[in-house]
């Protein structure tokens, strides 16, 4: 960049696809590098503690002003700023609005954009469509867990919630565990189940058996890997509960959505892993105990159990610590591992940066001029 002139690159969703945003293996490699950096501490997110998930705008159940949105499932706006160091050394922010009624209009529940910025000047580098950045990095963080924590000969994958995220998760897991040959699906709507099956048959032919399950129990029993990616429950609605007798020895649970386990099982019978323990500590500060009632991600139950004195802090293992050789991963083929995935804006900045760099190198996207010379400075 030749100052004072500032140009930025606009990347549409089509541009992002051309630049490789849907490459599940590269995205997983990127997220693995990111998790190592998180464990080392070479990053910042929002808030005084530098670990905030973001700033959320929510709405009242009964708005008193005409035109103000009304509270509902996944009804929010959110800004998610971050800086990530290492080879990335970029700042950025993902911004999105979410409304489940969008699907009736043929558009996604959440519509996301991201801005990447130069870490020194703050100058904008790129404004990009971020739905695919977010979807693929959301699948890739569990993917890192599968790569390092799942049994090597895993054959049966169970998914709960066959929406966009779990559909991409299936593709990611299939690339990382070619031994997978059976897919079990538990969903609520036939349309999403049908879309998922159509995608899998086209993109993941290694699955020779596809089973649609009527119950959560049916999906979990005999599954080597289980992924949960469901919509946020309504306030006061109980989270789906996994019973210990359903769980196969050696199973890996990837949990980026609302799910619950029996306290005793978490305390005594499973290895508990999180994507970044500091994220859950930040949530515990922002939403005091019982945090799990507000934040439906399972790692918040881990911190609640610690708050109650039922679980030691040492019982919660950071995946980045495993990747950096500071902690032990899977210890046997019978060990059950429960992996909580919270989702962080550093992930968007990291994967968005790699896609942006490729786009710049290959002439993809539209250059926009901010100014040749600033009017005020």
Give the ranges of each region predicted by the language model.
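Rossmann-fold NAD(P) dinucleotide-binding segment
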Residues: 221-222, 233-251
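N-terminal ligand-binding/catalytic initiation module
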Residues: 1-137, 141-143, 153, 346-349, ...
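Short helix-loop-beta connector
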Residues: 149-156, 179-180, 248
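Short, conserved loop/helix-junction motifs that constitute active-site signature segments
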Residues: 177-178, 242-249, 264-268
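Short glycine-/small-residue-rich Rossmann-like dinucleotide-binding loops
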Residues: 230-234, 257-258, 277
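NAD(P)-binding Rossmann-fold cofactor-contacting core
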Residues: 176-203
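Adenosine-phosphate binding glycine-rich loop
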Residues: 2, 13-21, 259-260, 264-375
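Glycine-rich Rossmann-fold phosphate-binding loop(s) that bind the pyrophosphate
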Residues: 162-163
């Amino acid at each position: 960049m030749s100052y004072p002139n500032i140009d930025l690159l606009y990347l549409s969703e089509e541009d992002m696809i051309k630049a490789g945003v849907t490459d599940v293996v590269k995205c997983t490699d990127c997220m693995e590098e990111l998790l190592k950096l998180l464990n080392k501490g070479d990053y910042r997110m929002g808030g005084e503690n530098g670990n905030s998930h973001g700033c959320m705008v929510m709405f009242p159940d009964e708005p008193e002003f005409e035109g103000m949105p009304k509270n509902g499932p996944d009804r929010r706006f959110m800004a998610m700023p971050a800086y990530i160091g290492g080879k990335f050394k970029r700042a950025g922010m993902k911004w999105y609005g979410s409304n489940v009624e969008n699907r009736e209009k043929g558009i996604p529940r959440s519509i996301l954009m991201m801005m990447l910025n130069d870490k020194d000047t703050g100058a904008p580098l790129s404004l990009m469509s971020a739905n695919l950045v977010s979807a693929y990095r959301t699948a890739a963080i569990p993917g890192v867990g599968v790569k390092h924590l799942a049994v090597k000969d895993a054959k049966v994958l169970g998914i709960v919630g066959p929406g966009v995220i779990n559909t991409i998760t299936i593709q990611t897991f299939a690339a990382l565990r070619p031994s997978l040959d059976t897919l079990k699906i538990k969903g609520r709507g036939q349309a999403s189940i049908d879309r998922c099956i159509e995608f899998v048959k086209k993109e993941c032919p290694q699955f020779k058996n596809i089973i649609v399950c009527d119950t959560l129990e049916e999906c979990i029993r005999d599954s080597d890997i289980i992924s949960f990616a469901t919509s946020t429950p309504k306030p006061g609605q109980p989270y789906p509960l996994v019973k210990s007798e359903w769980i196969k020895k050696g199973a890996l649970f990837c949990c980026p959505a609302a799910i619950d386990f029996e306290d005793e099982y978490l305390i005594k019978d499973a290895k508990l892993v999180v994507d970044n323990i500091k994220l859950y500590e930040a949530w515990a500060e922002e939403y005091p105990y019982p945090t799990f009632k507000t934040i439906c991600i399972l790692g918040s139950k881990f911190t609640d159990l610690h708050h109650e004195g039922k679980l030691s802090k040492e019982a919660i293992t950071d995946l980045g610590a495993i990747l950096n050789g500071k902690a032990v991963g899977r210890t046997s083929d019978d060990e059950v591992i429960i992996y909580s995935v919270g989702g962080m804006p550093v992930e968007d900045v990291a994967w968005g940066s790699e896609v942006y760099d490729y786009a710049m190198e290959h002439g993809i996207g539209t250059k926009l001029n901010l100014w040749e010379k600033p009017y005020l400075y």
